[in-house]
Amino acid sequence: GERPSRGRRDLRAGHAGRETAAAWDAFRAWAADELPASDAFAPGSGTPLLFGEALYLLPASSSLPLSPDHLAGLKVPRAGLHLGDVRKGRFQPAHALAMALGAPEAARVWTLGEDSPSAAAYLRGETLEVPADLRGWHLVTIACGGASFPLGWGKASGGQLKNHLPKGLRQHC
């Protein structure tokens, strides 16, 4: 389908039935494996909205109930939390989702030291070397002052952690 103009999205495009349900099911299946400790995406947590391949979650709120019908016809920059993109039936998580999570919620976490060369390499968008037995999506975090903070996603395979940090957020030095 046609993609909405950059920076603005028409909510009428996201109020589809079967495609949205299929995208939501793909996300829920991915989340069951990758985010087993998170209850943020349980039924009733919000309304899924699909724009092309991009899946968003419009949060539920008792104080301000919103639905796609309430927002129909409005131009909005982001219709909630960008969960990820569904391509060919497979879910790929969005950077915004990584930023919304804590390390305990993810099934697999790769933590970098705050002053480590690996942290600098990740922030430049480079692929990292990891143990060969690591597989799948990892929430990449940085350890700082006894806590871990999310940086983004990496996908491990064959001894490498492929960097999924958005290009616009990468450091150029």
What are these regions (language model features)?
Residues 1-173:
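Polybasic, low-complexity RNA-engagement segments
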